[in-house]
Amino acid sequence: FPNGGVRNTFEARGYSAWDPSSPVFVVDDTLCIPTVFIAYTGESLDYKAPLLKAIQAVTKSALDVMHYFDPSVKKIISYLGWEQEYFLVDEGLYAARPDLLLTGRTLMGHEASKNQQLEDHYFGAIPPRVAAFMKDLEIQALELGIPVKTRHNEVAPNQFELAPIYEECNLAVDHNMLIMSL
């Protein structure tokens, strides 16, 4: 198809490169290889390349500071500990909410009751159905190599949280993206 451009339309001029700092993993029957996607000019075309550049910049700056205290320091490793909070909604209630069905998120609601105290939820025991869900989620996470460490209730009703062991920044971000897809 003529397009009036200087290059063929099938030439995207973007390059994918394997990110060896993040391990490959298998989902169902598919081998997934973490990659970066950059333009032929070097511009980032995804979210991973800017993250790697930011980690590199933090490492360089941290090394500069560390050399004031100990000139023999050769390497800095940045760690990240994220938390993933989520709400659990019964399927029947979910189906009755057009905002959840259409967008996957809450768009309508109302303010909490005045002086509503939710310590009973935050400090309470995890309900058995929720604990079973959490266990299944943790097993799926471990199958992908995500070391989930903690689980607990959060402040709002039906709000819960999981968190993994601290990991190197790049790997922690990859694992967070994977957790959100489970």
Where are these regions (language model features)?
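Glycine-rich, acidic/polar active-site loops that bind/position phosphate-bearing ligands
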Residues: 1-182
